[in-house]
Amino acid sequence: MTQIDYTRAAKYFLLADFFKGFKLGMKYFFAPKVTINYPHEKGPLSPRFRGEHALRRYPNGEERCIACKLCEAICPAQAITIDAEPREDGSRRTTRYDIDMTKCIYCGFCQEACPVDAIVEGPNFEFATETREELYYDKEKLLANGERWESAIAHNLELDAPYR
């Protein structure tokens, strides 16, 4: 003789699991929407966000890059090419600083390796192009990016400073 489990039978016939699921569905149906209207609204970015590359300058206008080539050496995708020559005062500066953005994997190693914070990955993530050639960044393009995003880059580096 089998014993009947009345609690289980009541749950089955009264559709308890169905109504639990229905209640959960209605909770999310009437909850406020979390989707943002992207082109018109933008979500917050982390200070560590790695976007479009930029070369920075010192406040006096001199470029920061000292041509140590650490970023070129550490780049796992070999996307960075640097040529440099010494100046009359003995310091070295780059004559060519190219980044092939089609190769770049946005790992951030170049930014971490740079001893003077010359190369950084800025907050810009909207840099789609129509041709492949526009993704080959030269020194002038990188310096222009640095000038355009300097305030945001400096703010993000300041926020990230305790963790570096």
Curated annotation (Swiss-Prot):
Binds 2 [4Fe-4S] clusters per subunit. [4Fe-4S] cluster 2 binds at C75, C104, C107, C110. GO terms for biological process: aerobic respiration. HAMAP family: NDH1_NuoI. Its main location: membrane. It is found in: Cell inner membrane. It catalyses: a quinone + NADH + 5 H(+)(in) = a quinol + NAD(+) + 4 H(+)(out). This is NADH-quinone oxidoreductase subunit I. One of its GO terms (cellular component) is plasma membrane. It is a peripheral membrane protein. Pfam families: Fer4_7. Keywords: 4Fe-4S, Cell inner membrane, Cell membrane, Iron, Iron-sulfur, Membrane, Metal-binding, NAD, Quinone, Repeat, Translocase, Ubiquinone. Its cofactor is [4Fe-4S] cluster. Coiled coil: none annotated. It comes from Jannaschia sp. (strain CCS1). SUPFAM superfamilies: 4Fe-4S ferredoxins (SSF54862). Its EC number is 7.1.1.-. Gene3D superfamilies: 3.30.70.3270. The gene is nuoI. PANTHER family: NADH DEHYDROGENASE [UBIQUINONE] IRON-SULFUR PROTEIN 8, MITOCHONDRIAL (PTHR10849:SF20), NADH DEHYDROGENASE UBIQUINONE IRON-SULFUR PROTEIN 8, MITOCHONDRIAL (PTHR10849). NCBIfam families: NuoI, PRK05888.1-4, PRK05888.1-5.
